[in-house]
Amino acid sequence: RFRFTLTTNGVLLNDEVQEFVNREMDNVVLSIDGRKEVHDRMRPFRNGKGSYDLVLPKFEKLAESRNQEKYYVRGTFTKNNKDFSNDVLHLADLGFKQISVEPVVGSDEEDYALQAEDLPEIFAEYDKLAAEMVNRYHTDKDFNFFHFMLDLTGGPCVAKRLSGCGSGTEYLAVTPWGDLYPCHQFVGEEKYLM
């Protein structure tokens, strides 16, 4: 059986698409970077206007329609929001339970690129998140943060950690144009086009 995950920026999400996603997709990734100012800076429309106010209510509705399961909100932190624990907590305060905010991947020359000297600040943010997760445990504001989800009982996640990310064994990225890549990180790189 194939499992399908859809990643969406939410712009074209409507009731019909939501119904399809809930019926056909095993998982859905809702791409939002956290606080309004952070999201709008990195995800503007062509006219320069931010997309946060348009996509947030759609994402809240979709997460609820999936009973806060089988989805996650996925953001990216950059040099411009090294205080990304605030973005994670913003999303949790909005009611999202499944959250992943990950470091940007890109050229070191980009003005938003993270550098080695940023690591102490980044590590401190992870410490803040860990403490806040403990504080919120068993409250109505608790949440799962993807990077802290460890399987200490030896379940199926152990095999995944040993075999890697799944690229080439159980994972395939499909672009809107039907191009196939072994991983979403390789999309657009001609040498990885399958």
PLM feature segments, named:
Residues E37-E60, E64-W177, V187-L193:
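Radical SAM enzyme [4Fe-4S]-AdoMet core and its adjacent flexible, acidic
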